[in-house]
Design a protein with these regions (language model features):
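Short regulatory helix/loop adjacent to the ATP-binding pocket of P-loop NTPases
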Residues: 59-61, 109-118, 177, 219, ...
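Non-catalytic terminal extensions of ATP-dependent helicases
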Residues: 283-328
């Protein structure tokens, strides 16, 4: 996804290596990326398949110098139907010496277009580490087939905890988001049909705590490393076990504990990939009022070109906003 490309770029730069990196993805002008590539001369280019093919076809960087290819979330790329685009990328890189395919779940087979005849499997999972004692599974029963009110009560009960709600379709994400907002519940939405700026703003606010709840499709289930997510809610159940594993993988990360909630109406049953019956989570008859976030994000669309710096902004918040140092 675009967000995963941006996240990898940010993490790579935060490591302070001597190697320069550039991220390339849709939703913004390719010409700006070309200028950045030309000016930076990066050692690492991180990109989505479509945008990478765009730059390769225009010869915006020298494909002959690329010796290493890494495909992150490889199995999901196949599931999303990116085989042709990935094959086209590989076909334009004549001097590849190493190919890495990364995923949290195993692929059934390696397609021929990868050019991998003999593979070496590296497994970084610790077989002795059990997630079950850190991830707590619950089912929440909805008296109505339309589970909106049950979701609302659950989120009110969870209060200010960071919660990621998964729906199976973009339209459902929009519908759930609008309903919660109509109930004065502050939440963000995230799906592939949104404008890139809106997607990034939703993630930014969720990361920094100015939004406790994010409603998303499975776009947020892969790769995105958002720390301290306390709860995952399956408003809709995923189609398969891999989807369930990756969704739950957004919580209980790095030795932390987390909770996974499955909302079921009377006609729904648990799928076969959920082997153990989850404990039922009983909602209170009268849920608490929606919790307000502790922080608010202000977007200031000005910068150095407008002769505005960080000191000006902080001074404005002190003098005009009457804020204290510990409030910023």
């Amino acid at each position: 996804s675009r967000e995963l490309a941006l996240q990898i770029d940010q993490v790579f730069k935060s490591m302070n290596t001597p190697f320069k990196a550039v991220s390339c993805y849709g939703g913004r002008p390719a010409m700006e990326e070309h200028r950045t590539i030309k000016g930076v001369q990066p050692s690492v280019i991180i990109g989505t398949p479509g945008r990478m093919n765009d730059h390769l076809s225009k010869q915006n960087f020298d494909a002959d110098t690329v010796t290493t290819l890494v495909i992150d979330e490889f199995d999901k790329c196949l599931e999303f139907g990116f085989q042709e685009e990935m094959a086209t990328v590989i076909g334009q890189l004549p001097n590849l010496q190493r190919r890495f395919l990364l995923s949290a779940t195993d692929a059934e087979e390696i397609p021929q277009f990868t050019g991998l005849d003999k593979t070496i499997k590296l497994n970084f999972l610790n077989p002795e580490e059990q997630l079950t004692h850190r991830l707590h599974l619950y089912k929440v029963l909805s008296p109505e087939k339309d589970k909106l009110e049950t979701l609302y009560k659950l989120l009110c009960t969870l209060g200010s905890q960071s919660t990621l709600v998964f729906c199976n379709h973009r339209e459902s994400v929009e519908r759930v988001g609008k309903y919660l907002q109509s109930q004065k519940f502050q939440c963000g939405i995230f799906h592939g049909g949104m404008e890139q700026d809106d997607r990034e703003r939703s993630l930014y606010k969720f990361r920094n705590g100015s939004c406790h709840v994010l409603i998303s499709t499975d776009l947020a289930a892969r790769g995105l490393d958002i720390p301290e997510i306390e709860n995952v809610v399956h408003y809709h159940l995923p189609a398969n076990e891999d989807g369930y594993i990756h969704r739950n993988g957004r919580t209980a990360r790095w030795e932390a504990e987390g909770n996974s909630y499955v909302i079921l109406h009377a006609e729904e049953t648990l799928p076969g990939y959920i082997a153990d019956e989850p404990e039922e989570f009983i909602l209170p008859q009268v849920p608490p009022k929606p919790s307000l976030p502790e922080y608010v994000t202000l977007y200031i669309g000005k910068g150095k070109k407008d002769k505005i710096n960080k000191i000006d902004i902080v001074g404005f918040l002190f003098k005009k906003g009457n804020l204290n140092k510990d409030e910023i």
